[in-house]
């Protein structure tokens, strides 16, 4: 396994290539949502791995995207990045309305 480290993030190189092929977004592009003024975050425990994972929804190139990651050694380890599902977009828009930043 080859780990890529980039600005406080990390990811598996093969997983990143697979993600780009399937979802048409690189992990490097996806992490840009964390430098935007507003992104929504929630968490869950992955049943199989018993690991706390985070789901963040933000905007990249004018579209809502979802980034799934976990924390490892003070870095965010990216697991997946993709276009947001409808219910994720709804949660994100609700969050923006709540903080007074609706698009």
Question: Which role fits each region the language model picked out?
Answer:
Residues 1-103:
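Ribonuclease/tRNase effector modules and their secretory precursors
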């Amino acid at each position: 396994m080859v780990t890529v480290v980039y600005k406080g993030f990390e990811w598996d190189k093969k997983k990143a290539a697979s993600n780009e092929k399937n979802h048409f977004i690189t992990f490097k592009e996806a992490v840009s949502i964390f430098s935007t003024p507003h992104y929504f975050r929630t968490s869950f425990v992955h049943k199989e791995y018993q690991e706390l994972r985070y789901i963040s929804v933000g905007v990249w190139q004018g579209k809502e995207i979802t980034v799934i990651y976990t924390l490892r050694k003070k870095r965010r380890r990216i697991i997946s990045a993709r276009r947001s599902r409808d219910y994720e977009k709804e949660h994100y828009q609700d969050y923006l309305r709540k903080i007074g930043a609706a698009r």
